């Protein structure tokens, strides 16, 4: 448990200055009203879940290493994947901040898009963030029976039109119809196998993963491995997002709303609509706004609109 706390604490502290800088930027441009302390503790439920995941992973892997010696890494990789899948499954149950969507028109659109995308009914919920920020967002999460789509309430307000809201809804439902979250777990498995092997090799001289003194080195290796694999992970994420955009265009048949949505995002997110290549490689989990507008126009041209 102490090792899990150490691992989470180190990872959290390393990233904290960057998150503070990002929050300072949103405060400077009046995109957030949360003070620094309130902002830091706002995601305590997710942080607690991550802490439990790290503790569980370390306990199991250390037990496997003491039992199997250097052969722990393959079943250890399976443990990492199982915990990731479990976290994705239970995450919606940790959500205490959302309410059911009450917009009957948008709910009717959801039922129609679900039918076109071959989905069973997906709960659509709303997270109230307008007291804290003006930024807009929506996301899909959960797997199997816990699948959800969540709108920030700012996404359901001006300046976003009904057409833009429908595009966002279709995009998030497309993540579920294309099984992007299970696919993400599958990609994680492909990263976890070599990652576990590298952990085994690099911790050998410290007594292996079964020895407590090897844990700080193991945590460093994990951080470096994540940094090295970030460009590939971002490439995979951008492909999924582009696929969801394309599916959204197919069911809404409204490229103009997708284009205007991207213009709206450029104003509310404070992001660069056309970031340099290195930034997109290392930080871009979504296609650039310019690329997404180009997709909308290409779809319209193909349809002869």
Go through each PLM region and give its residues.
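Polar-ligand-bearing catalytic/cofactor-coordination segments
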Residues: 1-209, 231-305
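Multi-pass membrane glycosyltransferase architecture that uses lipid-linked
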Residues: 206-221, 229-231
